[in-house]
Amino acid sequence: MKTLLVLALLLLSVSVQAKVYDRCEFARILKKSGMDGYRGVSLANWVCLAKWESNFNTKATNYNPGSQSTDYGIFQINSRYWCNDGKTPKAVNACHISCKVLLDDDLSQDIECAKRVVRDPQGIKAWVAWKAHCQNKDVSQYIRGCKL
C-alpha cells in the first residue's frame, strides 16, 4: 500500500511539471499544425508571440485583476473570452474548452484555440505582447537557425 502511495505521488508530481519548449521545437510543432501563414500570420510571428507571452512555458498563468480573468498556457489565452476556468465572471468560452487543457504539454488544443482567436476581427492584435514586441518588427530571428 505504501508503495502505491509513493508511486501515485510520483506520478502526480510528474503530471504538474511545466514543459518549457525550445523555440525551434515549438516552431516545428506550429509548422506541422498548419500555423505558418494561418490567417496571414507568419510562423516567426507566432513564435515571437509565445516567447513574449509565456517564454514557451506551457504552465504560464497571469491573473488580470481588472477583468478578474486569467491568461493560460503557452499562448496566454484569456479566460474571459476563450476558455472556461470556472471562476471568471461573464466568461464566453469561445474555444469551448477548459482552461486547464491549456496548461498541459499537448499543444493541440492551445493551437486550435489560438486559431480561433485570430479568426476574430482583431486577429493577432488580440495579444498585447505581440503588439508590444513583434508588430512591425523583424521577427525572423525567432525562427533563424531552426531546421524547418
From Swiss-Prot:
SMART domains in the record, alphabetically?
A: LYZ1
Gene Ontology CC annotations of this record:
extracellular region
Q: Which reaction does it catalyse?
A: Hydrolysis of (1->4)-beta-linkages between N-acetylmuramic acid and N-acetyl-D-glucosamine residues in a peptidoglycan and between N-acetyl-D-glucosamine residues in chitodextrins
Q: Which residues are annotated as active site?
A: E53, D71
Q: Where is the C-type lysozyme domain?
A: 19-148
- Cellular localisation: Secreted
- Sorted UniProt keywords: Antimicrobial, Bacteriolytic enzyme, Digestion, Disulfide bond, Glycosidase, Hydrolase, Secreted, Signal
The main enzyme category here is hydrolase
The entry lists its GO molecular-function terms as: lysozyme activity
Check the UniProt entry and state the signal peptide residues, or none: 1-18
Q: Does the keyword Glycosyltransferase apply?
A: no
EC assignment: the record states 3.2.1.17
Q: Which cysteines are joined by disulfide bonds?
A: C24-C146, C48-C134, C83-C99, C95-C113
Please tell me where this protein is predominantly located.
secreted
Question: Its GO biological process terms?
Answer: defense response to Gram-negative bacterium; defense response to Gram-positive bacterium; digestion; killing of cells of another organism
Under the heading Pfam families, the entry gives:
Lys
Q: Which family does it belong to?
A: Belongs to the glycosyl hydrolase 22 family.
Relate the protein's function as given in its record.
Lysozymes have primarily a bacteriolytic function; those in tissues and body fluids are associated with the monocyte-macrophage system and enhance the activity of immunoagents.
PANTHER family in alphabetical order:
LYSOZYME C
Q: How does it assemble?
A: Monomer.
What more the UniProt record tells us is: Lysozyme C is capable of both hydrolysis and transglycosylation; it also shows a slight esterase activity. It acts rapidly on both peptide-substituted and unsubstituted peptidoglycan, and slowly on chitin oligosaccharides.
Q: What is this protein called?
A: Lysozyme C-3
Q: Which organism is it from?
A: Sus scrofa (Pig)
